[in-house]
Design a protein with these regions (language model features):
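N-terminal pre-ligand scaffold of iron-sulfur
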Residues: 1-95
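Long, hydrophobic, well-ordered secondary-structure blocks that form the structural core
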Residues: 79-133
């Protein structure tokens, strides 16, 4: 894989090597070095959803393939959260829905608030030092 240098002086600019556009290694490196580290636009607030709305989507399909869910809480705040349960990696929300008060994983019932913070897990309410935040 050819290495290239980007000079801070614009007068010394040059194009990227053609290998950057056609080699798989560059594609994979751009995922880890660029796309996984930057903000990615997924929408604006023109389509404001009512409280309790959950909208699952895949962030950058065929590139990151990151499952996320947009949730709107009772204050109208919109959150973009990982759509993968922290326990077993199951998708938490499979299709868009409304009127929800929590996110609940279908595997063991682990629950999260609409802002993504941990709420509860069945049969663990009496367990000492079990995470609650």
């Amino acid at each position: 894989m050819e290495i290239f240098h980007i000079d801070e002086d614009i007068r010394k600019s040059e194009t990227l090597p053609s290998s950057f556009y056609r080699e798989r290694a560059w594609f994979e490196r751009s995922i880890s070095e660029i796309w996984e580290k930057c903000w990615i636009f997924i929408g604006d607030n023109t389509d404001q959803n009512p409280a309790g709305t959950l909208t699952p989507m895949i962030l950058l399909p065929d590139v990151l393939n990151e499952p996320v869910v947009l949730s709107t809480d009772s204050d109208g705040e919109v959150y973009c959260l990982s759509n993968v349960c922290t326990h077993r990696g199951k998708l938490v929300v499979s299709s868009s829905c409304s009127g929800q008060r929590i996110l609940r994983c279908g595997y063991h019932g682990r629950c999260f608030r609409l802002n993504g913070t941990f709420k509860s897990m069945p049969e663990f309410d009496q367990t000492e030092n079990f995470p609650t935040e």
